[in-house]
């Protein structure tokens, strides 16, 4: 039986990230990004093999961009595409695993939009456009929140009036589930352990960041909550703050809820602390030049990350290893070293040479001999979405 091809789509409000995944090959035959959709500057960029190219598509919407992409995908797939996997940010409590998309699923995703107003409507745009263009192909939704539906109630409930949960779904959902699941499976494979008999602390660190406690292949706790704002310090997101900050700023500065929400999501985190940048690479460079804001931002980021990992350990029966993934987790030896140094009670120690070597896609163990396992594992959410899609086609 010839190997199968899955197109993976991740739609934002004005962008489409795409990858063609072949089940038999680790490299993507085709991948790219359509961005600034709906504007005169809309552009489609792609890589195929070692070649890169782009095409201006002025005023194109999601459907027009996908239509431009269609012949490219068919050509790269050798004329045979077997299905389309869609990343959907929020599945609420309705979806605990990947699901074939039909009218009922579309309406359920629409119903969860109030829980992810910036993401789910955009995800739906991509789904509806793709289903129009590829009506005969199976479409599968893979939810960021689904992996965390195994959280026990004591981990997902807030200490709020019960009616808010029962009537309005106010609870902790968690995100980055596809990434945490993928790297925990890879970690078990690398360590020679069974997924169903292993326990991991996972740190997905990028512009959005979260930690996760994974036991026997299930998420038992995670740092993000009702929204992706809860938890760690991130690129522009504050992470955890005093819940009374809203009323304090409204009372003392006269700020509206919208202004406070924008500040916490778009002006805080590494950017707010450093007053310089949300990019860890820039901050590390500026720290070397003596920039105090950059140094502080990195210190706060690593300390808060270590605190979160320590908190996640409450859900583990034993620790088989700590996993670093995501753009920062995969590429910042400094962040990994500083975080490990804060976790002295875990007896974590890193091998400096191994830590320095694991960047730009290099995976591997970075712990010093005789100390608990620490792994750097590049995430591959596109491949995981493709695998979930293929599983529903079998």
Swiss-Prot record:
Superkingdom, natural source: Bacteria
InterPro entries: Ac/propionate_kinase, Aliphatic_acid_kin_short-chain, Aliphatic_acid_kinase_CS, ATPase_NBD
Keyword match Cytoplasm: yes
Pathway assigned to this chain's UniProt record: Metabolic intermediate biosynthesis; acetyl-CoA biosynthesis; acetyl-CoA from acetate: step 1/2
Catalytic-site annotation from UniProt: 144
Assembly notes: Homodimer.
Function, as annotated: Catalyzes the formation of acetyl phosphate from acetate and ATP. Can also catalyze the reverse reaction.
Name listed for the protein in its UniProt record: Acetate kinase
Species of origin: Pseudomonas aeruginosa (strain ATCC 15692 / DSM 22644 / CIP 104116 / JCM 14847 / LMG 12228 / 1C / PRS 101 / PAO1)
Gene: ackA
